[in-house]
Structures are given as structure tokens and as C-alpha cells.
């Protein structure tokens, strides 16, 4: 009888110790998902887009796709707080401040004004930008190869010399080229400066036409059509938002519009040798994956578009009575 009592006490002690160890382990696991790995927690990414138009939307979507392809599925390993500043810098500042308060793990900034807003708000949260033409002049990084700040990303700088060569090839007798832009956008001013440098080399007289907002685009385009043989549209957020208006207004006077990226050609511009913004955003997403895995943005070089291709709108060419040389059509992406 005494022996049975001892066995009972021993069994009870073993059970009690087992329960204590189990409870302790459960408590530790509750504090650190997947056995204590901080990397397993759901990442919070704030996305600020300066305004809504197809090129910027494509860049944003490409970024999200890159993260998904790397295993960061929305709602599982990452959440996105998508915000649009509606082309208002005060709204952009409010959004940037919100991301900082929320202690986001990373911020995507789409276009120069959005990137400047978030960089002004935080020097610690990693920032990845896309669709920024000159991040050095914008004050975001110290250099393209060595950012030196909490910012890196993908630039949409386009080879304007290549665009002007397209005009030469298609319109060999053209002399005057219009340049529609918003002087309030630093990215557009950079492109204008570049165009002024290379236009004379192509034998062109560049005629800049400023616009201050969307409501000015139609009138500005109409004014240009009486002075130029062709119109070039840079990656200007204001003008690109009204590209359909630019194309329609110019078409009335049989003036071709040359674009700086594929989205403009899809909406009626004649041709471009430019950027695929979804691919550019995808590159930015790949940089974000590196940062989420522990890389420091200040050591990740700024990237530019890896592949530039010719895109031509055949319907626009037909409507304008313009023949596209076979040398361009051979490898071009064709939009009917």
C-alpha cells in the first residue's frame, strides 16, 4: 500500500513538471511567431502615389507583383496601405506623416513629389521610389551608385536623344519640336534641360510650352500646334494625366505626338522608345525584397530601366498619314 502511494506521488510530480514546461514553451512561442523569428511577422508597407494615371498605376502594380513573386503575399506576409495624394503636396505630407506614425516597415513612393514628401518625414524608415527622373537633384540620394540615405529605387530617366532620333527617322524634314511640361515638376525640368542640350545636335528647334495644371493642357497643346512639326511629351505627371487630350488636340492639326513611355502610345501617341512602367516598378519591388531581407538602402544603387523598346501605334500613324520605316517596325511592339 505504501509503495503504491509513492508511485502515485511520483506520477503526479512528472505530470506537473510536464505541464509547466509545456506552458512555458507556449508562452515563449506566443511572443515570437515561428519559434522566435522576427522575419516571420507580417510586414507593413505604405504606398504613396502622387496622382492617378496609367504609368504610375503600372509602376505600383509591378512593385506589388515583385513582392508576391518573392513570397510576400498580400494579407499573409505583407499588408499594403495604398494612398493617393491627388497631386496635392499638402496631402502627400499628411500621408507621409501617417506612415511614420504607423511605424511601417518600408515605404514605396511613386513619382518625385511623393518621394520627397516621405523623405522629408523620415530618415529612418527604408524608402523605395519608382518613377523618379533624377533622385540626386531631387535631394533623395547622394549619388546613384551610393545613395547614402534611407532611400533607393528605380529612375525613369529616358534617353531623350533616342526619342529625338525617332522624330528624325519618321519626320526627316521636321524643324520645330514642341515640349509640353509642368515647370512645377522637378522631373520635367530635368528632362527639359536635357532636351535643350541634345535638340540642336539633331537639328531641331525646341519650343517649350509650360502648363500649370490639367486645365491648361488643351489650350497649351492648341497653341503649340501652330508652331511645331511634332510634339514631345516627357514623363510629366500633369501632361501624361491628360495625354488623351494632347493627342486629340494635336490630331486635329495633323501634328504627331511622340511619347516617352508605352502608356502614352497606348492612348494615342504615335511612337516611343521608352519605359515599361510595370517593369520599372517590378525592379523597385526587387529592391524592396532585398531591404526586407536585411539589406541597407544606402548601399543599394539606384537602378534605371533595363530594357527600352520601340512601341508604335499603327492606328495613329494611319490617321495622320505617316509611314513608319520598316527598320523601326521590325522589332517594335505594335498597338492597333
Stretches with model-predicted labels:
Residues 85-142, 233-251, 255, 260:
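Beta-alpha junction/loop-to-helix N-cap segments that form part of ligand/metal-binding clefts
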Residues 45, 63, 152-199, 301-316:
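An alpha-beta-alpha
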Residues 180, 186-255, 259-261:
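Pocket-lining segment of extracytoplasmic ligand-binding domains
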Residues 293-336:
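Hinge/cleft segment of the Venus flytrap/periplasmic-binding protein
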Residues 42-70, 81-90, 184-188, 238-241, ...:
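Extracytoplasmic "Venus flytrap"
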Residues 1-44, 69, 73:
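Short, low-complexity disordered leader/linker segments with a strong preference
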Residues 135-174, 276-295:
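Hydrophobic alpha-helical segments within soluble ligand-binding/sensing domains
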Residues 79-101, 210-224:
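Structural motif
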Amino acid at each position: 500500500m505504501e509503495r503504491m502511494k509513492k508511485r502515485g506521488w511520483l506520477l503526479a510530480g512528472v505530470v506537473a513538471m510536464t505541464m509547466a514546461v509545456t506552458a512555458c514553451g507556449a508562452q515563449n512561442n506566443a511572443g515570437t511567431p515561428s519559434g522566435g523569428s522576427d522575419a516571420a511577422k507580417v510586414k507593413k508597407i505604405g504606398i504613396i502615389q502622387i496622382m492617378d494615371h496609367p504609368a504610375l498605376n503600372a509602376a505600383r502594380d509591378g512593385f506589388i507583383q515583385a513582392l508576391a513573386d518573392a513570397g510576400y503575399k498580400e494579407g499573409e506576409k505583407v499588408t499594403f496601405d495604398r494612398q493617393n495624394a491627388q497631386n496635392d503636396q499638402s496631402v502627400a505630407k499628411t500621408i507621409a506623416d501617417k506612415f511614420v506614425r504607423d511605424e511601417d516597415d518600408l515605404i514605396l513612393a511613386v513619382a518625385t513629389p511623393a518621394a520627397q514628401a516621405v523623405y522629408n518625414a523620415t530618415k529612418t524608415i527604408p524608402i523605395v521610389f519608382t518613377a523618379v527622373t533624377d533622385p540626386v537633384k531631387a535631394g533623395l540620394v547622394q549619388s546613384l551608385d551610393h545613395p547614402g540615405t534611407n532611400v533607393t529605387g528605380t529612375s525613369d530617366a529616358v534617353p531623350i536623344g533616342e526619342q529625338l532620333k525617332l522624330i528624325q527617322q519618321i519626320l526627316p524634314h521636321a524643324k520645330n519640336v514642341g515640349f509640353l511640361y509642368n515647370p512645377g515638376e522637378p522631373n520635367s525640368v530635368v528632362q527639359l534641360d536635357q532636351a535643350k542640350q541634345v535638340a540642336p545636335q539633331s537639328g531641331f528647334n525646341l519650343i517649350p510650352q509650360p502648363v500649370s495644371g490639367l486645365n491648361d493642357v488643351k489650350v497649351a497643346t492648341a497653341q503649340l500646334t501652330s508652331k511645331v512639326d511634332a510634339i514631345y511629351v516627357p514623363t510629366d505627371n500633369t501632361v501624361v494625366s491628360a495625354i488623351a487630350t494632347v493627342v486629340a488636340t494635336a490630331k486635329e492639326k495633323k501634328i504627331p505626338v511622340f511619347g516617352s513611355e508605352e502608356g502614352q502610345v497606348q492612348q494615342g501617341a504615335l511612337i516611343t522608345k521608352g519605359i515599361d512602367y510595370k517593369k520599372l516598378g517590378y525592379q523597385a519591388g526587387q529592391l524592396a525584397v532585398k531591404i526586407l531581407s536585411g539589406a541597407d538602402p544606402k548601399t543599394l544603387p539606384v537602378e534605371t530601366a533595363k530594357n527600352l523598346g520601340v512601341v508604335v501605334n499603327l492606328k495613329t500613324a494611319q490617321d495622320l498619314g505617316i509611314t513608319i520605316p520598316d527598320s523601326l517596325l521590325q522589332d517594335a511592339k505594335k498597338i492597333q
